[in-house]
């Protein structure tokens, strides 16, 4: 069994530093995928992957790389769906896991919100601000996901 790999949808990810710390503790590889050259620590477990700036290029790369040994970190519901179908574990940056059971309702809610925004303009609102509790929940969830993947329970 190969070691777990954390695939990060990195362009707007607020928990990159937390990912690095947890990955180092577990000896897990991290692939930081973005459309631009983000700064990443110089560490043998961390790889920066810069994709083209084409629409969904980072999502496409992550979805192709995702498998049962992967943990994908993304707030993108459609990417989460693709990664789950590839067998990966998926976490939102706030620590909420996406699962095969929860992804359908999440996609439906996303579609409803898109329709509301289209009909009412941008005044519908978005997610709440990222909090310290979100960060703590993410750290716990990533640690637990890595343990599950290492044990083959994901």
UniProtKB/Swiss-Prot annotation:
InterPro entries in alphabetical order: UPF0178
NCBIfam families the record matches: PRK00124.1
Family: Belongs to the UPF0178 family.
Name listed for the protein in its UniProt record: UPF0178 protein Sala_2376
Lineage: Bacteria, Pseudomonadati, Pseudomonadota, Alphaproteobacteria, Sphingomonadales
């Amino acid at each position: 069994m190969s070691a777990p790999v954390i695939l990060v949808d990195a362009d707007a990810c607020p928990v990159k530093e937390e990912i690095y710390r947890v990955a180092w503790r577990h000896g897990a590889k991290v692939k930081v995928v973005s459309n631009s050259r983000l700064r990443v620590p110089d560490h043998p477990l961390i790889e920066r992957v810069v994709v083209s700036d084409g629409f969904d290029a980072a999502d496409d790369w992550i979805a192709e790389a995702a498998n049962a040994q992967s943990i994908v970190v993304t707030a993108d519901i459609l990417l989460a769906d693709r990664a789950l179908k590839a067998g990966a574990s998926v976490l939102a940056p706030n620590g909420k896991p996406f699962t095969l059971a929860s992804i359908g309702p999440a996609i439906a809610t996303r579609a409803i919100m898109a329709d509301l925004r289209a009909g009412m303009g941008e005044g519908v609102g978005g997610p709440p601000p990222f909090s310290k509790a979100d960060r703590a929940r993410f750290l716990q969830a990533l640690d637990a996901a890595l343990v599950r993947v290492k044990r083959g329970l994901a």
